[in-house]
């Protein structure tokens, strides 16, 4: 028995030694790609700087309250402004408006422009948008946040198996997960690039709602 104990001790110590050695082993080659922030890059070429300035100016011409209009409406709050025309408020391919998707792209673009220019006006505007989205999410009361017209009902019908699809529509409504994806990506960019903590809070609430209220309730047939 004593011999077995000694053998077991030697094996254990050998394993610990190997783990330690593996943990301190250095890679044979260096990383071929080094990631860097947009804040570390500045455009000096006259032509490209002009294009960046035009983008910067255009982003600031868009009105947050118009981009937020459908979010407030779907949350039961009074919109502060009418939504933008065309895809944001008119019928698109028989699925109604593609409400809310522009705000997702807008948040992504604004967060990147902030890293590039450090313009405080952009940061102030993003803080306003995040605060408004947080109000909408709180009004729903369960983490849900979307501008899709009757979006929550679409998810409920899908869970019940009462739906038809005709890409990109579901129950004659623009597929809400697409729009949710754009909003979540925008919030992620705002959190990572601008360090606005409430953007992360909203994002986590949306993810929890989708996980618990949609994915957990779906079966293989759905």
Question: Residues of each region from the PLM?
Answer:
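Glycan-recognition and catalytic cores of secretory/periplasmic carbohydrate-active enzymes
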Residues: 22-222
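Bacterial Sec-dependent N-terminal signal peptides
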Residues: 1-25
